[in-house]
Amino acid sequence: MKPNILVARAVFPQILTLLEQHFEVTSNQDDVLWTPAQLIAQLQGKQGAFTTGSQRIDAQLLAACPELKICANMAVGYNNFDLDAMTAVGVLATNTPDVLTETTADFGFALIMATARRMAESERFLRAGLWNSWRYDMFAGSDVHGSTLGILGMGRIGQAIARRGAHGFGMKVIYHNRSRLDAATESACGATLVSKTELLQQADHLILVLPYSSEAHHAIGAAELAQMKPTATLINIARGGIVDDAALAAALKQGTIAAAGLDVFEGEPRVHPDLLTVPNVVLTPHIASATMPTRLAMAKLAADNLIGYLVHGEALTPLNPQLVKA
């Protein structure tokens, strides 16, 4: 008898076909946004779940779903998982690293460019029919080439962004990370380790690429924003909650920093209302990995984790690997 799994959000048809070769599949192809109680109801009798990062897997859910053995996230981030609770009851957690690195780095750099060059502001201005003449300072932003790029969090995506900055735009690249990169990697990235204070004070464009954790909560708040240059931009493609969005909105209004570009938000999909009223911020709905090839690769990796574990007792990218058979 095939194991039963739940696909919690709509997914590529070819991925659904692949999963149906191995499992009895209950699929949410109508893409209904289930409440926690509805998710628990849907997971009854299921051994596996294909999740997308928006389904909270916590102790309460796990207690109500005793047959669950694996949750495969179609995302590199996994702050929707209570990993300790999952491990305690023997539920494997997996994610989809690596396959989205270059695509996400592309988007991060696009957001740097759009923010520095005030693209969203000028596009709104044009659509509103307000362009009637040329001015020497009309939507004059800041240069990217030759400027200082600061990176907070220097994992795979941070390194890919560093390479683009150093080798593509001739930027001085500085970074802060929990641990220093080896000398060869630093050289390949053209990056120099600095303290967090130095990063804040020196960066012309500061991009956040660190994973969310309780220690990283509000890593950028009013005090940190006050240390940045008034001409600086802040880019967040990491996770909501790393930035204090209320403090950022205030800083943008007050001119503490010049502009921001945000792909993630605290409490998303809700966006802090003050961010919606300031002109000098570029807002996108968590789409840094959103190209068709990359999203398909992410879905395929999540599916392969489900197949690998429930059929063969193995997993490609486990987050609690102690649960996988040696």
What are these regions (language model features)?
Residues 1-94, 221:
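An N-terminal-biased, well-structured beta-alpha scaffold segment characteristic
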Residues 93, 231-326:
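Rossmann-like dinucleotide-binding domain for NAD(H)/NADP(H)
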Residues 150-153:
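Conserved N-terminal Rossmann-fold NAD(P)-binding element of oxidoreductases
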Residues 57-59, 180-274:
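Rossmann-like adenosine-cofactor binding region
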Residues 167-186:
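NAD(P)-binding Rossmann-fold cofactor-contacting core
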Residues 97-148, 160-164, 168, 183, ...:
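Phosphate-binding beta-alpha-beta segment of Rossmann-like dinucleotide-binding domains, i.e.
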Residues 8, 51-52, 74, 111, ...:
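Short, well-ordered coil/turn residues at beta-beta hairpins
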Residues 157:
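Hydrophobic/small residue at the entry helix of a nucleotide-binding pocket
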